[in-house]
Amino acid sequence: MSRPGTATPALALVLLAVTLAGVGAQGAALEDPDYYGQEIWSREPYYARPEPELETFSPPLPAGPGEEWERRPQEPRPPKRATKPKKAPKREKSAPEPPPPGKHSNKKVMRTKSSEKAANDDHSVRVAREDVRESCPPLGLETLKITDFQLHASTVKRYGLGAHRGRLNIQAGINENDFYDGAWCAGRNDLQQWIEVDARRLTRFTGVITQGRNSLWLSDWVTSYKVMVSNDSHTWVTVKNGSGDMIFEGNSEKEIPVLNELPVPMVARYIRINPQSWFDNGSICMRMEILGCPLPDPNNYYHRRNEMTTTDDLDFKHHNYKEMRQLMKVVNEMCPNITRIYNIGKSHQGLKLYAVEISDHPGEHEVGEPEFHYIAGAHGNEVLGRELLLLLVQFVCQEYLARNARIVHLVEETRIHVLPSLNPDGYEKAYEGGSELGGWSLGRWTHDGIDINNNFPDLNTLLWEAEDRQNVPRKVPNHYIAIPEWFLSENATVAAETRAVIAWMEKIPFVLGGNLQGGELVVAYPYDLVRSPWKTQEHTPTPDDHVFRWLAYSYASTHRLMTDARRRVCHTEDFQKEEGTVNGASWHTVAGSLNDFSYLHTNCFELSIYVGCDKYPHESQLPEEWENNRESLIVFMEQVHRGIKGLVRDSHGKGIPNAIISVEGINHDIRTANDGDYWRLLNPGEYVVTAKAEGFTASTKNCMVGYDMGATRCDFTLSKTNMARIREIMEKFGKQPVSLPARRLKLRGQKRRQRG
């Protein structure tokens, strides 16, 4: 059947004759130069029901899809089940994390077992079958490299469960009746349902990974399915196991990914999944990823034009703990004058938490030079941030040696700390599962089951309660809020990794920091906790909201995709209205986040940077992800030089530590470091700044912040108060200073006794 107005019956007969003449051409069809220019003008609508008449295009096939579908309802179970080369072990439905063995992330889906070579090479569809087993990367359903327009299905329940939602690891929102549900779900539960991927070029398909529906309330997954391929979306060839259709074993629960590799690779443009059975109490719903190698096509200008390449000579692979340590050592040997490797503590399993320092004087704090840090891997399965930081360290070293003026200036004027893996225990667990089979949560938590991202003390509540009682800043400061004693006790549920980070941040006077996370494309800034306790989402700004907005935008706007209005959402949230940025509390509330703790307990302004929709992309995607984030990573580091900086000294020129720097109109102060130097992040404008310290007279200045990069110098010299001078003189001569309140009380007592 052809579309009305698209072809005459005579032309259709000619095409049919050409197709039948190609049967048995022994693969010559793949060399047909007309293939590359053919238009799929006769393609049926994507959501139409497959017609049995299509089988007339494939007379050599023993049974077409339509015939098989007519027989299937009479059988209680599929007659044959394929033995998967990489089947995940069976687990209970409540199993939280899958541990598929031997799935190293830098060898994604590479190891295979032998299987029978499929028969039936004589067919009308131009499909090539390979004898040699080959491993191929994912096509990119999870990373969104495959667009929504390339996904099609027979039927859908509703738009929110359309084919475009059938992506591996896609997450549903809390409200599952909106446009953002967690799978493709067929409109009917029968054997004629399918979901299809158009690769838009010849591709060597090698495997399929499936999941059930992501849902808090429903249990839906496919337990077995067939795989079909086509070059024109009309004539389909089912993957065979000998002489019969191969039935692949699907999922046994809804979250653990299951891999099935094809017995032999199939070369085609389209691939279709046809569910054969599903969970008894559920519906036909699935998420998936396709493994395939696009074939070179010199005639296709579109693909050549859109290929992402990088010129940076970096180590684009996933590194386990040992390899990460070795890479750090190599970088240190390449750039010994600007790098230093150290550790901030140990994980629960005893793995050292290594960091790389980059500075022209590594190992020491230079007066007047700001400190910056990047952290990644708080969630062990969010691997992209870890690899981006390892790439960043290599890049900075190479560019410094090449005397790149921008990088040289950054290194000489900034002390940079890079902590690529805060949760190495979790990462090793995710690394063992691999990039595609780890699911959404394998390795997220520490070894003792703690989520580091919300394991810091909740200082927000302490501050807000004090503000409600009007005790700020008289009794409770608006900054440097002390950690509660219960949190410091050994019995507190605090991860070893969390304690290590807190000690690290208290030791080094960080000014700006970014913690890299995954699963979204957005930059989140504090506060992360809502102020209204009965709400789960509420815009909760800090006193420095305008500064945080700029810092977030500086990263998002220089990222290749974050502010692209044409890109689709990763899962459920559309952050384009805020230009790729979001206030953490207005997104979802988190108590005890690193961002809030850093802002309220230290001088550091911390933001969460979500660098990709795919938490654990295949290593073949790392060059593209590096290109997406490279400029952003550098620009964000440069923001540490925005605002004002200076020294607070006494009349003898000695730096005053812990002096308070206040900015009029901003209810959040910072303090000077041990040498009396300070850095205050501010947007361009004129500010009234006050420096004060115990025992000194406060000093106020007008400080101007310009638009050019580089902090404005604003120094203060404080003189001691009269009482401080008296105390100093009396201590010098060995006498105790007079306590005026005590003396007044003594005089009053004497007067009472005299009257009595």
Swiss-Prot record:
Residues 317-640 form the Peptidase M14 domain. Residues 68-78, 113-131 have a biased composition (Basic and acidic residues). InterPro entries: CarboxyPept-like_regulatory, FA58C, Galactose-bd-like_sf, Peptidase_M14, Peptidase_M14_domain. Glycans are attached at residues 231, 241, 281, 337, 491. Residues 51-131 are annotated as: Disordered. One of its GO terms (molecular function) is zinc ion binding. Residues 134-293 form the F5/8 type C domain. Belongs to the peptidase M14 family. May be involved in cell-cell interactions. This is Inactive carboxypeptidase-like protein X2. It comes from Homo sapiens. The gene is CPXM2.
